[in-house]
């Protein structure tokens, strides 16, 4: 049987939420109610050999329902929002052709925005420019490059942490390639873009948001401790032994991995590494919640409520 035209399909359910908000549990519960296939919306889960620190679903969970865009690239490679859009659109069509329902699950809000609102026209990544910026960062540190960014693009610099290496590098790269601040380029593109509301009709967005952020913070600390007890440091040691990975790669910049890498370099002690890993995860959580709350089409569920899974199921309508 051929797939129905897109307009005849129900909206694609997108289950979005910050780290430790219970997305996996809710998604697996939905899979018990309907023939779904999960499309991961997570920039860290794409990497092979990075299981513990990314809180990747267990083998049993992965086997219980089809998952996509997990374990698809090597840690030496990178994966972009553009690649996600291409892969997600292909997967949505393939899943529907099998008579199943696609369920997008994750917390990489940039990927969701690219899928539903389109990609921007910023310059493509330039390996030579990035290599030069990596050299500068190695010499001076990322806070120094953050200061450089503040001189040429204060708007972008103001919303980035001084150690947000990946985003600082991208903003400086765009400025070097275009001669213009990234914030101005994005503002001009937003001014010239009109949205028809089609995204609202094609996607049903369920957002897991905490009524009490302290509960989520406690979960984050407990989960990070569980990762450390479960072999996270040994996982990073195995990655280091490969010999082809370094802290400048997007994979090793993932929250948690960067902090453990620094610990294994001897730059910090265990207690400092643990604290920095928890703080970095909480900062990621804060950014994710900010993104979610700027998404007007979302249907909000309190992820610390005892019946949040049941609420998600009702809103999903599967």
From Swiss-Prot:
One of its GO terms (molecular function) is tRNA dimethylallyltransferase activity. Keywords: ATP-binding, Magnesium, Nucleotide-binding, Transferase, tRNA processing. Residues 42-45, 166-170, 253-258, 286-293 are annotated as: Interaction with substrate tRNA. Its EC number is 2.5.1.75. ATP binds at residues 17-24. The keyword Transmembrane helix does not apply. InterPro entries: Dimethylallyltransferase, IPT, P-loop_NTPase. The record marks 108, 130 as: Interaction with substrate tRNA. Its cofactor is Mg(2+). The keyword Cell inner membrane does not apply. Substrate binds at residues 19-24. One of its GO terms (biological process) is tRNA modification. Belongs to the IPP transferase family. PANTHER family: TRNA DIMETHYLALLYLTRANSFERASE. Catalyzes the transfer of a dimethylallyl group onto the adenine at position 37 in tRNAs that read codons beginning with uridine, leading to the formation of N6-(dimethylallyl)adenosine (i(6)A). Monomer. HAMAP family: IPP_trans. NCBIfam families: miaA. This is tRNA dimethylallyltransferase. It comes from Cupriavidus pinatubonensis (strain JMP 134 / LMG 1197). The lineage of its organism: Bacteria, Pseudomonadati, Pseudomonadota, Betaproteobacteria, Burkholderiales. The gene is miaA.
């Amino acid at each position: 049987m051929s797939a129905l035209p897109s307009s005849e399909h129900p909206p694609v359910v997108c289950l979005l939420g910050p780290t430790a908000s219970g997305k996996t549990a809710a998604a697996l519960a939905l899979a018990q109610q309907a023939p779904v296939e999960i499309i991961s919306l997570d920039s860290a889960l794409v990497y092979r050999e990075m299981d513990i620190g990314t809180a990747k679903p267990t083998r049993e969970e992965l086997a219980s329902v089809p998952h996509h865009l997990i374990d698809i690239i090597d840690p030496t490679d990178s994966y972009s929002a553009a690649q996600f859009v291409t892969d997600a659109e292909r997967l949505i069509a393939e899943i529907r052709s099998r008579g199943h329902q696609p369920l997008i699950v994750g917390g990489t809000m940039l990927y969701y925005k690219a899928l539903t609102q389109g990609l921007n026209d910023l310059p493509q990544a330039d390996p030579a420019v990035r290599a030069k910026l990596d050299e500068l960062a190695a010499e001076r540190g990322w806070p120094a490059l953050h200061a450089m960014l503040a001189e040429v693009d204060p708007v972008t610099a103001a919303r980035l942490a001084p150690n947000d290496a990946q985003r600082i590098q991208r903003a400086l790269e765009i400025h070097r390639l275009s001669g213009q601040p990234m914030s101005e380029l994005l503002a001009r593109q937003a001014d010239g873009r009109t949205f028809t509301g089609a995204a609202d009709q094609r996607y049903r967005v369920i957002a897991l948001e905490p009524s009490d952020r302290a509960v989520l913070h406690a979960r984050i600390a407990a989960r990070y401790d569980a990762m450390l007890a479960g072999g996270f440091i040994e996982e990073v040691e195995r990655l280091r032994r490969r010999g082809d990975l370094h802290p400048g790669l997007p994979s090793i910049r993932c929250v948690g991995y960067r902090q453990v890498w620094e610990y294994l370099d001897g730059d910090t002690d265990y207690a400092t590494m643990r604290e920095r890993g928890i703080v970095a995860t909480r900062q990621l959580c804060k950014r994710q919640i900010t993104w979610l709350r700027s998404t007007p089409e979302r249907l909000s569920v309190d992820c610390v409520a005892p019946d949040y899974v049941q609420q998600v199921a009702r809103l999903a309508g599967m």
